[in-house]
Every structure is written in structure tokens, then in C-alpha cells.
Amino acid sequence: MIKKLSLYTFALLGTLVLFNSCKKEYESVETLDTRSIKEYLAKNNIPENMDPSGFYYQIINPGTGAAVANTDSVYYTYDFKHADGTSITKNGDYTIPGTFLGYTDRFSFLTIPAVRITLGKLKKGGAARVILPSRMAFGKNGLTALGVESNEIIVIDLTLPLFNNQVEVDNFLINKFITANSLQVTTDPTRVRYIISAEGTGKTDLKETSKVNVKYTGRFLNGTTFDSSTDGVTFTLNELIPGWYKVMPGKIGTGGKIRLIIPSDLGYGQSSQTDGMGTVTIPGNSCLDFDIEIVSITN
């Protein structure tokens, strides 16, 4: 009986030791997070505002537009950073995501409620910063692919721009692109911007229903090429995206060269384009930049 009791006692003590060690490990991570965050706040003169869920935040600009709820469609920007300010990942320079506020916490690598909660504290036009404890971010494993270390706190800069629809977003991004690249463009009534470098011959021959042989390069606004043909390929013009067939007729002829900067609704719209393997080649709501040369026209 004594032997059995001793074995039981030792087993119980072992369980308690294991439980306490786990508890201490958790508490040590929490303590480490708190110390790292307080050091960051002090260094950057940021007040200690802690959300009840455990993350810290700073309202940089509360915004002057409408308040937002989880069921509202919003446009937002994000920049995940190390505590030293180095960017980890962010929305692209020429990408502004839009979705329901309730879905803004969903990223390909993690779901982060702190993003949704903090955006919900803003009005449109606002900006905020989230200081995320490691246990609410990438934890003790970190994320090697993004260069995040074990138990590293993460800073997330957020904005809630004053855009009401995709047309406003596209106009903003295209104007930003034009300014950044010092382009001299003409704006078509369709909102497509264009630059004609060579008119070619017989520009009145080019109609929406024409068969055209073209050489072209298609890029995103960040300069990445998504499609091209240097040998020439034949299409019926009105079977292509509206940004081509609504703009090109009457502007260039055979041998003509034009650059088109196309809003997303005159490109592929909200739908992502995929290749034969299902890989996204053109994300939805992408503005596009084309260089086009007309090799021949057939009516």
C-alpha cells in the first residue's frame, strides 16, 4: 500500500511540476512581450494604450470621415514592421486592398484580430499603429520566410483611406504612377491614360471589329511583366479588354505604337485571372500598363 501510494504521489508531483513549468514558460513569454513593448513605447514616445484583448495601439489620426462597422466595405493599407522600423511585409505600392471591415484581419500567413479591432476604432481617413505581442503574432517559432525571429513583437502601421469605390482607388494609384514616372499622358474619356509614340499609317482603319496583329508587353504598375508577345499575335480587337478596344480605334494605325495605362474596370475587373494550373496571374482590381505596337490591321 505504501509502495502504491508513493508511486501515485510521485506521479502527481510530476504532473504538478510539468504544469508549473509550462505555466512559467508562458509567463516568461508574456513578461518578455511586456518588457519589449514597454521599451518600444518609451523609445518612440508612444502612450501605453492597451486593448482589452492584450495588444497595444496608437491612434495617429482618428479620421474625419464616416465611422465604420464590421459589415462596411473599406479600403485599408498595412505595413508589418520589426521594432526597428524595418518593413516585413505590406500591401504593394500600387495596391490598396478592399473588403468588409470584418475580414481585414485575414492574411495569408495569419489571422490577426488586432488589425480589424484597431481599424474599427478609426473613421475613414484615419491612421493607427498596432504593437503586437509575440504570442498574438508569430509566437516562439517566428516565421523564417518573413524574417521574423522567435518571440518577436510586431508593429503594424494601418490607414483607412477616404476612398468610397474602386474608381477612386484606381484614379489615385494611376495618378501616383504617372507622377512617380514623370509621364506626359493624355486622358481618354474612358479614364484610360495613353501616350502615342508613333501614329503609324491608316489610323482610321483600326476599328473595334478589326483583326490586329500586335506586339505588346503588359505590366502591373509596379513594373512586373505579366504577359508579352515580341513576335506578334493576332486578335479581334473587341474580343480583348475594354481598355484596348474602347481607346485604340482612330488613334493609331499600322506601325503605330501606344502606351495604355488602364483602370481595373477596363482591364479584368474584380475577377482574378489564372493560368492552367490555377495560379493567379493577374489579381482582381489590377490597374494595367501596356506597350502596344500594331503590326497589321485586317477588316
Each model region followed by its residue ranges:
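Cross-family detector of peptidyl-prolyl cis-trans isomerase
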Residues: 2, 6, 22-299
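Sec-dependent N-terminal signal peptides
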Residues: 5-16
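C-terminal motif of bacterial Sec signal peptides marking the signal peptidase cleavage site
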Residues: 17-21
